[in-house]
């Protein structure tokens, strides 16, 4: 990939930039933020760290929209982070106009770029970005499930004592309290999770995964998760930049999959050099479909709320 721009030089954007630059996932990396000098300073720091790691990725930062020119991929992390006691929806009224301004800049300066939305509430903002972009769903999608899956794997490893490397997990639906962890698809070394944990233990892991972001927020007091989201972004960027055809969860615009249309939901997708190559529709049992529908109904209400703003 030639040029990647991260819009939002906060902790998440910076964490992602560090990995992207270190791993040379693009030739040119831009950190863009309304606080131009902050973006410049962080970009210089990231660039110097990348050089120390043997990377040739060129990193620079600033505030001007023209910095988007020629971007192959734009990652949007800008917006206010959650504070203790806030839900992702609480920040919608603040982050929506920020996203709208960014999308206007992208349309003017990088109309062919792929757009990866990370800002919360990610389901609603991904839908908004897609709806105003004029692009197909292959070019506009969001990050949530990679992070949620990693959290679940951590909690399973903690509970069982097994290596997280041997754990597979899968999360669908909205990002937050309405997410749908598919425990039937969770395994440790190809052995179903139910072989190792009781139903009660599994439900505790599910609930902790749903509250994973809030748990970190409550403990840190002054900031939300940043390092794990940064790694999740870098994983998705790697899949796109290197055309890996990886199956990763992403917030995608559904077009009839899982019985839903015109909505952005977390589902397993194939990420390749063209962006989101396709949505994978898994067979769900009646209980799983009911949970997915409940999650979709909540996201649909959130989208309606967004449209009313």
Swiss-Prot record:
Domain of life: Bacteria
Keywords linked to the UniProt accession: NAD, Oxidoreductase, Tricarboxylic acid cycle
UniProt-listed Enzyme Commission number(s): 1.1.1.37
Protein residues bound to NAD(+): 8-13, 33, 95, 118-120
Amino-acid positions noted as binding substrate in the UniProt annotation, renumbered to this chain: 82, 88, 120, 151
Single Gene Ontology BP annotation: tricarboxylic acid cycle
Transmembrane segments: none
Enzyme class: oxidoreductase
Example of a GO MF term: L-malate dehydrogenase (NAD+) activity
Reaction catalysis annotation: (S)-malate + NAD(+) = oxaloacetate + NADH + H(+)
Pfam family, one: Ldh_1_C
Signal peptide (from-to): none
Active site per the UniProt annotation: 175
PANTHER family attached to this UniProt entry: L-2-HYDROXYCARBOXYLATE DEHYDROGENASE (NAD(P)(+)), L-LACTATE DEHYDROGENASE
Protein's job: Catalyzes the reversible oxidation of malate to oxaloacetate.
Family assignment from sequence similarity: Belongs to the LDH/MDH superfamily. MDH type 3 family.
Protein name, entry field: Malate dehydrogenase
Organism: Pseudomonas putida (strain GB-1)
Gene name per UniProt: mdh
């Amino acid at each position: 990939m030639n040029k990647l721009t991260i819009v939002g030089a906060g902790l998440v954007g910076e964490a992602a930039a560090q990995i992207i630059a270190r791993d040379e996932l693009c030739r040119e990396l831009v950190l863009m933020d309304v606080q131009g000098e902050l973006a410049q300073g962080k970009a210089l720091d990231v660039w110097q760290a990348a050089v120390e790691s043997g990377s040739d990725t060129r990193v620079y930062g600033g505030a001007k929209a023209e910095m988007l020119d020629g971007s192959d991929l734009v990652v949007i992390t800008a917006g206010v982070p959650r504070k203790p006691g806030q839900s992702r929806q609480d920040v919608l009224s603040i982050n929506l106009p920020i996203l709208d301004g960014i999308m206007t800049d992208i349309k003017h300066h990088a109309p062919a770029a792929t757009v990866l939305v990370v800002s919360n509430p990610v389901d609603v903002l991904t839908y908004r970005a897609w709806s105003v972009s004029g692009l197909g769903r292959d070019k506009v999608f969001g990050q949530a499930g990679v992070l949620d899956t990693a959290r679940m794997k951590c909690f399973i490893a903690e509970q069982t004592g097994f290596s997280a490397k041997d754990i597979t997990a899968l999360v669908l639906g909205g990002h937050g309290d309405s997410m749908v962890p598919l425990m039937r698809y969770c395994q440790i070394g190809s052995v179903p999770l139910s072989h190792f944990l009781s139903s009660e233990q599994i439900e505790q892991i599910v609930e902790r995964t749903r509250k994973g972001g809030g748990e970190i927020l409550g403990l840190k007091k002054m900031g939300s998760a940043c390092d794990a989201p940064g790694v999740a972004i870098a994983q998705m960027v790697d899949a796109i930049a290197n055309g890996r055809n990886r199956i990763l969860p992403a917030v995608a615009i559904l077009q009839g999959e899982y019985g839903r249309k015109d909505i952005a939901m977390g589902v397993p997708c194939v990420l390749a050099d063209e962006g989101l190559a396709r949505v994978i529709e898994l067979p769900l049992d009646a209980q799983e479909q009911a949970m997915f529908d409940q999650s979709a109904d909540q996201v649909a209400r959130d989208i309606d709320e967004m449209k009313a703003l």
